[in-house]
Amino acid sequence: MKFMAENRLTLTKGTAKDIIERFYTRHGIETLEGFDGMFVTQTLEQEDFDEVKILTVWKSKQAFTDWLKSDVFKAAHKHVRSKNEDESSPIINNKVITYDIGYSYMK
């Protein structure tokens, strides 16, 4: 069964565009076995903060778990972690939610 992981970022108002632009350059996730795709979305009409969701689609939950343990993951997130600890980080909060994909259709 296919698997999806959502990383929901709550951001300082006005910073979503900069966060989304970071994804324009791939950092190796696309090379991993089991990776099927990614969507980076911005929730519309948030008044007090910005919200960005990073949705990754995998062939299986195991493929996602393998990515979390990979050097590719560590390299792509090493600067994110240090910025989160910095008070100037635009990231207020994040939450990871996972899903089994029961059905999908894309044209």
From Swiss-Prot:
Q: What is the effect of changing residue 38 to A?
A: Slight loss of activity. Changes in heme binding
Impact of changing residue 7 to A on the protein?
Answer: Loss of activity
GO CC, alphabetical:
cytoplasm
Query: Which GO MF terms does the UniProt record name?
Result: heme binding; heme oxygenase (decyclizing) activity; iron ion binding
- Catalysed transformations (reactions): heme b + 5 AH2 + 4 O2 + 2 H(+) = delta-staphylobilin + Fe(2+) + formaldehyde + 5 A + 4 H2O; heme b + 5 AH2 + 4 O2 + 2 H(+) = beta-staphylobilin + Fe(2+) + formaldehyde + 5 A + 4 H2O
Instruction: Extract the Pfam families matched here.
Output: ABM
| E.C. number | 1.14.99.48
Q: Where does Fe cation bind?
A: 7
Report the residue ranges that make up the ABM domain in this protein: 3-92
Summarize where heme binds, as residue positions: 22-29, 77
Any further remarks?
IsdG seems to carry out oxygenation of the heme without the assistance of any of the prosthetic groups or cofactors normally associated with activation of molecular oxygen.
Please describe the quaternary structure of this protein. Homodimer.
Q: Which family does it belong to?
A: Belongs to the antibiotic biosynthesis monooxygenase family. Heme-degrading monooxygenase IsdG subfamily.
Protein name in the entry? Heme oxygenase (staphylobilin-producing) 1
Q: Which gene encodes it?
A: isdG
